């Protein structure tokens, strides 16, 4: 299974929601006790960069007035930080990091999506999602997909009304490759 770059955010959203201070304070996060632990494969790195020129989420200050900085929220699969605003930091008894996301980056790989399709032989290229459900407590999610079946690197037939159901910890630990085509038109 390959997910096109502009659609990865739909799956990633469940992880990001579990990283916010509200979820942590309410004990409604499957990542609650996972800081410093492996939550994905070594290829799973999530960078929050508020200083990208013309980035949709760019800014010098966050919603609490703190100066922003680039952060590796997840690096090589290890959860480094949470999104904790000033209010939640006092409730949790920890230092604030930042209240929310800015520009999220999954670093690109070295190979094209076409090369990866050839390597896999047979699979589904997901190019859209239809609804989704993610449980921040458990990490379980399900999402409807649209896409195209590929065989030997060639797109063969469309696929619709199919579901993916998994757990975020399991899903992100199966990340095997990232293509070299980052999607820059989103925050």
Residue ranges and their predicted role:
Residues 2-35:
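Active-site pocket-lining segments that scaffold enzyme catalytic pockets across diverse folds
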